[in-house]
């Protein structure tokens, strides 16, 4: 039951183009004054910068 729910949720988010990808420093672009107020800016949007896995 839980697996079916998780699968349906993932399929729903993917079909809505809501996919969360970790942001690394290679993806960051220069910020404009009217860009998002938190995190860093990428060509796809903005979010928190992820550090290297330890």
Curated annotation (Swiss-Prot):
This is Secreted virulence factor MC69. Transmembrane segments: none annotated. Induction: Expressed in conidia an all stages of infection. The keyword Secreted applies. It comes from the Eukaryota. It is found in: Secreted. Disulfide bonds join 36-46. One of its GO terms (cellular component) is extracellular region. Disruption phenotype: Impairs pathogenicity. Exhibits a defect in appressorium-mediated penetration in rice leaf sheath cells but neither in conidial germination nor appressorium formation. Changing residue 46 to A: Significantly reduces appressorial penetration rate and blast symptoms on barley and rice. Belongs to the MC69 virulence factor family. Keywords: Disulfide bond, Secreted, Signal, Virulence. The keyword Disulfide bond applies. Its main location: secreted. Secreted protein required for appressorial penetration of intact host epidermal cells and for pathogenicity. Residues 1-16 form the signal peptide.
């Amino acid at each position: 039951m839980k697996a079916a729910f998780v699968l349906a949720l993932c399929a729903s988010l993917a079909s809505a183009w809501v996919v969360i990808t970790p942001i690394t420093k290679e993806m960051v672009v220069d910020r404009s004054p009217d860009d998002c107020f938190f995190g860093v800016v990428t060509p796809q949007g903005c979010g928190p910068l992820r550090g290297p896995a330890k």
